[in-house]
């Protein structure tokens, strides 16, 4: 019995504790990211933002959560009730399970699998299903149009994101996310410089993937009222909201891992190794999240045809050309990784 416990039950308990240790801080980060967004945008617009609930407004996310929790969940009479309820759950759960392969520091990762990049791509591709189901199940033309926009937008930018990730794989030679970070420790500076344009393309693409300004067409208030979540209230709306912000943190972590060295110190400065890698990871993710908020506060929304044109006529040929360029340069300089 003891052998059975230590061989089968104990590993499951350890995995469950690791999941809780990642999920609870992540949900708190999502809650306070909404607070940070309102404060940053308020300061950029020369106003205070939330500053009443608690000192400096720090209890505002808790007040918002309590308000949404006690609101009445209203399901439209013609909606597909089961799918209507499942859609926000799918969106929120998929935004959390992507964190299983993200390395927070050296050796600190829930599942250090050798196909981590494929896992992340699969999860990011599945996340659109929650939005499509919500648009269909709501039985509303605004919600359905928002869902169609979201699916077209994600398909358009997944292609260029895939080519960008191929350039990263060409330089690192591994699908393991920890391996990608460690490969950047010894990577020549000119390869980092060659990947810089792809890092910018990747960041713009994840703006479109997460439906953030200037690409928030699926929920454009002036055109679609609120898009795919127009019929949602109470915790259904809250789960969509949490899913969007959890996705923001996830794609910031992906960008950090692929292009900013993950938990490595900036520019591989050796005397900064004394600072824990987790600090550098959080610092880089926080910087990218600030860029998300900065962009929302400063840029206007694209038209839908401009969004599609950027994805298919600019990013797709550019990333395809860059894959050929990077592979050619690495081949002729004999810097292709040994796999």
Swiss-Prot record:
Membrane topology, as annotated: Multi-pass membrane protein
Entries under PROSITE patterns matching the protein: COMPLEX1_ND1_1, COMPLEX1_ND1_2
One GO cellular component term: plasma membrane
EC class (word): translocase
Domain of life: Bacteria
GO molecular-function terms, A-Z: NADH dehydrogenase activity; oxidoreductase activity, acting on NAD(P)H, quinone or similar compound as acceptor; quinone binding
Cell compartments where the protein resides: Cell inner membrane
Reaction catalyzed: a quinone + NADH + 5 H(+)(in) = a quinol + NAD(+) + 4 H(+)(out)
Primary location recorded for the protein, binned into one broad class: membrane
GO annotation, biological process: aerobic respiration
Pfam families listed in its UniProt record: NADHdh
Stored InterPro entries: NADH_UbQ_OxRdtase_su1/FPO, NADH_UbQ_OxRdtase_su1_CS
Keywords: Cell inner membrane, Cell membrane, Membrane, NAD, Quinone, Translocase, Transmembrane, Transmembrane helix, Ubiquinone
Enzyme Commission code: 7.1.1.-
Spans traversing the lipid bilayer: 9-29, 82-102, 115-135, 161-181, 187-207, 235-255, 275-295, 311-331
Family membership: Belongs to the complex I subunit 1 family.
Function: NDH-1 shuttles electrons from NADH, via FMN and iron-sulfur (Fe-S) centers, to quinones in the respiratory chain. The immediate electron acceptor for the enzyme in this species is believed to be ubiquinone. Couples the redox reaction to proton translocation (for every two electrons transferred, four hydrogen ions are translocated across the cytoplasmic membrane), and thus conserves the redox energy in a proton gradient. This subunit may bind ubiquinone.
PANTHER family: NADH DEHYDROGENASE SUBUNIT 1, NADH-UBIQUINONE OXIDOREDUCTASE CHAIN 1
Subunit details: NDH-1 is composed of 14 different subunits. Subunits NuoA, H, J, K, L, M, N constitute the membrane sector of the complex.
NCBIfam families, per the entry: PRK06076.1-2, PRK06076.1-6
Descriptive protein name: NADH-quinone oxidoreductase subunit H
Species of provenance: Rickettsia akari (strain Hartford)
Gene that produces this protein: nuoH
């Amino acid at each position: 019995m003891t052998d059975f416990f230590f061989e089968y039950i104990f590993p499951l308990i350890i995995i469950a504790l690791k999941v809780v240790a990642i999920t609870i801080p992540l949900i708190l980060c999502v809650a306070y990211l909404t607070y940070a967004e309102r404060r940053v945008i308020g300061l950029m617009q020369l106003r205070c933002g939330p500053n009443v609930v608690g000192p400096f407004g720090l209890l505002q996310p808790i007040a918002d959560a309590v308000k949404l929790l006690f609101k009445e969940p209203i399901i439209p009479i013609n909606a597909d009730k089961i799918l209507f309820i499942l859609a926000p759950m799918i969106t929120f759960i998929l935004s959390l399970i992507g964190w299983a392969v993200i390395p927070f520091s050296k050796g600190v990762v829930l599942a250090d699998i050798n196909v981590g990049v494929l896992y992340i791509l699969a999860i990011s591709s599945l996340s659109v299903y929650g939005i499509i189901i919500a648009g269909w199940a709501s039985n509303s033309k605004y919600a359905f149009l928002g869902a169609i926009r979201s699916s077209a937008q994600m398909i358009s930018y997944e292609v260029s994101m895939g080519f960008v990730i191929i350039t990263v794989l060409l330089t690192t030679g591994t699908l393991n996310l920890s391996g990608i970070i460690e490969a950047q420790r010894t990577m020549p500076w000119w390869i980092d410089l060659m990947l810089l344009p792809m890092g910018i393309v990747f960041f713009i693409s994840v703006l479109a993937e997460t439906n953030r300004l200037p690409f928030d067409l699926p929920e454009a208030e002036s055109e679609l009222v609120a898009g795919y979540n127009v019929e949602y209230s109470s915790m259904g709306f809250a789960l969509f909201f949490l899913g969007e912000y959890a996705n923001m943190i996830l794609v910031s972590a992906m960008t950090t891992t692929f292009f900013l060295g993950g938990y490595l110190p900036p520019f591989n400065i050796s005397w900064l190794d004394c600072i824990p890698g987790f600090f550098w990871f959080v610092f880089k993710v926080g910087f990218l999240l600030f860029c998300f908020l900065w962009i929302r506060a400063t840029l206007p929304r694209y038209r839908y045809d401009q969004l599609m044109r950027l994805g298919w006529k600019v990013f797709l040929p550019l990333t395809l050309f860059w894959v050929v360029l990077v592979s050619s340069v690495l081949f002729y300089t004999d810097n292709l990784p040994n796999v």
